């Protein structure tokens, strides 16, 4: 398949309903290379943090977020960058959504006994430098990933959590020992997808009173789309990602091993390490006129930390 002349892989899901079959199509851009922050859809600061985490020789790097937050796309972008290096990369996926030259990709097949966990154990016998596990779905896969990380491998995987600090709690809830979670975790990239304002009908105005409370005093003008034929009169066209990057340091390792709460880890990351939260990153996009205050409200509703 192709989108606007660019190659793309197509994934189709069809289910039967009482009104007939319902189909959902997922397009994955196969022509994107992670060579700049713009390509990756993130700030220079967060991009630099991701590259620093990937330079570490071992540890687990999680990409987290809800379903449909672009985790797979980000994971493939990272793999493509790593594939340019002289390293042995093995990936276990379900399904393989994009073929990447230079990477040994395995397709999960539960009927044949190939699961994420068994594939991961098999990959460890292939002398890998980097292992990608498409999704950490169960405690056994998590524990094997932890063992791989502490024995000198860089492990990339995804988890369903709301923010970076919440990933630590998720690991412990899935059965990881605190001291092993502390020693194995290298970094976390939490992300969401937000809609971009249509460039053809973009306009601006001053925020109203409610929007000022949401945005804070730093943003004096906001942009939005009035709606046009090109965007289907929605005011939006395309999507981009917002990110939250947590690079694990010695203090965070000690906090994890000591059983600190999610809020304490988040507070340290934000106030001491200067981590920009998902909300902070989205405020940046609102200020730049890339997305709207409406998207900020949608993202932060019910997710603000105390």
Where are these regions (language model features)?
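Short, flexible helix-loop junctions that flank or precede catalytic/ligand sites
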Residues: 1-306
